[in-house]
Design a protein with these regions (language model features):
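Catalytic domains of carbohydrate-active enzymes, especially glycoside hydrolases
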Residues: 199-225, 320-325, 405, 480-484
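Active-site-adjacent "subsite" loops/lids of carbohydrate-active enzymes
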Residues: 182-195, 263, 268-317, 471
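Aromatic-lined carbohydrate-recognition surfaces of secreted/lumenal glycan-active proteins
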Residues: 262-270, 327-328, 353-392, 447-459
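A short, solvent-exposed loop/turn motif at the edges and junctions
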Residues: 79-94, 155-166
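Beta-strand-rich domain onsets/edges
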Residues: 16-35, 98-111
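Short, acidic Ser/Thr/Gly-rich low-complexity loop/linker segments typical of extracellular
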Residues: 47-70, 123-125, 133-147
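Structural motif
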Residues: 32-49, 114-126
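Substrate-binding cleft of secreted/luminal carbohydrate-active enzymes
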Residues: 403-417, 429-433, 439-502
Length: 502
């Protein structure tokens, strides 16, 4: 009995004493698994998101917005391969885990290079080029680059030209896209006509029912009137604004009908601005006041660059509003008055006149092409046939280099006896238009497009103008693969002379 008690006491004593083995004692934690971070960047060093990274075949992951992805280091040399949409794949060999535990893989983009030209092969600048989400603009030499390109359709558009496209299969190499000139068949809506609901509706119906595919709307006319509530403060300050329409409404009507939208801005005949700021006007050497035409209109001095500010501001606003093309009228030196008394700030000899006008239009083209608008210049028809600038600064060869469209005003009624061998040129509308174009077109190198104004009104010698006379002019123009614009001061046109719409 005593032995039993002793044994039990020893047992209890042992159970109450310290343990001989502590759980986990002497077991070290497993070392952390090393990781390698891969940063995928483009040729500029910027991170590429959504790039696929292959870690030697044992792991694949996509980069985040920071271009980074991490995976376990396999404790052996590994080939890291990276690829991304619009880039050439690339790889690097990693022999040992770097101290920074980071490597960088640079991908070179897939680049499509090309050139935009007209049908004759002349470069076309400021064309919008797109391939999926990748966009670019053609440069002055017509060249463009599409970076990060994927196979698909290359689309090219440019105001004054028809859009074009081609399928690109992903093969690198230069491509050429040739644009055909847009064949415009247009009428003109004066400010009052555009602002009259019935007259505007009639012009839209005319376009819907006939071959008309464009409309010219006056922004500023020969009297200097601006026909909408412009944000160009100068127009309000000089009292030139007479609100007739909302351009947003007119443009919406044109876009709804897929009609090409042109606005006409009279550049240098402006009595409002010349009266308010006589220092911008042509001077009169005899009277010491601004020079005036026989009809009392003041003319701005084209050699004074300050006189350019106002018409260019209106042009930029018109382009921003959504017009496709900005057409400058009266973009010349003055006529129809005592021009021998006209004085200018800058050179006004033949060379000086040409430099002033071409410089103004070049400035307009520089500003407006970059905004997506074409630039057109109206010119006297006489400059197509006669050499020199005819005192106007409209040297046709020089103008062709600085505008997208040249619109000679070929009105048979404005030709005097003897022109083209006719006693009354007005009685030979088709022949007059054809002869004038044949004289001038060889002198107008591309990519400038020739698009004449032609006559839809009765004036001068001969009979009245109607279906036959208007159609003969249209036919003469179209035989030369050109578009045209009908002029009528009241915006009332001879519908019977027009072909039905498609």
């Amino acid at each position: 009995m005593g032995r039993f008690l002793l044994w039990c006491g020893l047992l209890l004593s042992a159970c109450s004493g310290p343990s001989l083995l502590v759980v986990g004692e002497g077991v070290s934690p497993a070392p952390p698994v090393p990781e390698l971070e891969v940063v995928v960047v483009d040729h500029n060093g910027d991170p590429i998101a959504d790039a696929r990274v292959d870690f030697g075949g044992f792991d694949r992951s996509d980069t985040g917005s920071d271009g980074k992805v991490t995976s376990e280091w396999p404790r052996r040399p590994v080939t890291i391969e990276a690829s991304a949409a619009g880039f050439h794949p690339s790889s690097i060999e990693v022999l040992d885990l770097p101290a920074t535990r980071q490597v960088k893989v640079a991908l070179e983009p897939v680049v499509v290079t090309g050139t935009v030209t007209d049908l004759s092969g002349k470069a076309v600048s400021w064309a919008a080029v797109s391939l999926g989400d990748v966009v670019a603009s053609s440069k002055s030499d017509g060249s463009f680059e599409l970076v990060r390109a994927l196979p698909g359709v290359i689309s090219v558009s440019r105001a004054a030209f028809e859009p074009a496209s081609l399928e690109w299969d992903g093969t690198e190499g230069a491509v050429t896209v040739a644009l055909a000139p847009r064949t415009v068949k247009s009428v003109r809506a004066g400010g009052s006509a555009a602002g009259d609901e019935e007259r505007w509706a009639e012009l839209l119906r005319l376009a819907e029912d006939t071959e008309i595919n464009a409309v010219v709307i006056d922004t500023k006319d020969e009297a200097g009137i601006v026909f909408y509530n412009t944000r160009v403060e100068t127009a309000h300050e000089i009292g030139a604004v007479s609100v007739k329409y909302r351009p947003e409404d007119l443009l919406a009507d044109l876009k709804e009908r897929d009609l090409y939208a042109i606005t006409r801005i009279v550049a240098f005949q402006d009595t409002f601005l010349g009266t308010a700021f006589p220092e911008l006007a042509v001077g009169d050497s005899a009277l010491g006041v601004p020079w005036k035409t026989d009809r009392g209109q003041i003319w701005l001095d084209p050699t004074d660059r300050d006189s350019w500010t106002y018409p260019l501001a209106l042009a930029e606003e018109a382009c921003a509003l959504g017009y496709d093309e900005i057409q400058f009228d009266y973009v010349r030196f003055p006529s129809d008055g005592p021009v021998d008394r006209a004085t200018f700030d800058g050179p006004s000899d033949s060379s000086g006149r040409s430099v002033a006008i071409t410089s103004f239009l070049a400035e307009a083209k520089s500003r407006l092409n970059s905004m997506g608008c074409a630039v057109a210049s109206d010119v006297f028809a006489v400059v197509l046939t006669s050499t020199g600038d005819q005192g106007l600064g409209q040297q046709i060869e020089d103008l062709a280099a600085v505008v997208d469209v040249i619109s000679p005003m070929i009105y048979p009624s404005h030709y005097s006896t003897g022109w083209f061998g006719f006693d009354c040129p007005n009685d030979h509308p088709g022949e007059v238009v054809g002869n004038a174009l044949d004289d001038g077109m060889p002198r107008i190198p591309g990519p400038a497009i020739v698009r004449p104004w032609i006559q839809d009104f009765t004036f001068g010698c001969g009979g009245s103008y109607g279906k036959e006379e208007v159609r003969s002019q249209i036919d003469a123009v179209e035989e030369r693969d050109l578009g045209w614009i009908l002029w009528n001061v009241g915006s009332r046109f001879t519908e019977s002379a027009l072909e039905p719409g498609e």
